Amino acid sequence: MGLLYALESIRTPVLDKIMSVITLLGGELFFMVIAVAVFWCVSKREGYYLMIVGFFGTVINQFLKILCCVPRPWVKDPGFTIVESARAEATGYSFPSGHTQNAVATYGGMARYTNKTWLRVLLIVLTVLVAFSRMYLGVHTPLDVGVS
């Protein structure tokens, strides 16, 4: 919780908005749009790959949430506050992070297929930013995003 309290101490309204936008990049809707766009516009094979990885990743993620039953950080420590705009989507258990898992599946899957170093680096940075945003918003712990 120490890292989460440190992140809580640096929150600002501007950073809250930026991190809220970044976290959307790991959302299920964004993942589905990217997978379909890759399928239609880039490669059916890569699109199928993203869809399959995303589907099974989501199933495994939900199974682990139910199996482990790890509460959200603010449930573990009622003195901890989250960015309120993130509360609506932060339902259920905390471990592992679905947004981070989606980012790893989507951007990691895309990085696997690209030969462009700059794009591969950008995709990895996006994945790390989504994981960081989940902790900044206060909805996940480092363990939640690290395992995802």
Stretches with model-predicted labels:
Residues 1-31, 61-92:
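N-terminal transmembrane-helix/juxtamembrane module of multi-pass inner/ER membrane proteins
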Residues 12, 41-44, 113-116:
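Juxtamembrane helix-boundary/capping and inter-helix hinge elements in multi-pass membrane proteins
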Residues 19, 34-35, 48, 58, ...:
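Membrane-embedded catalytic cores of phosphoryl/pyrophosphoryl-handling enzymes
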Residues 44-53:
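Alpha-helical transmembrane segments and their helix-start/interface "positive-inside/aromatic belt" motifs
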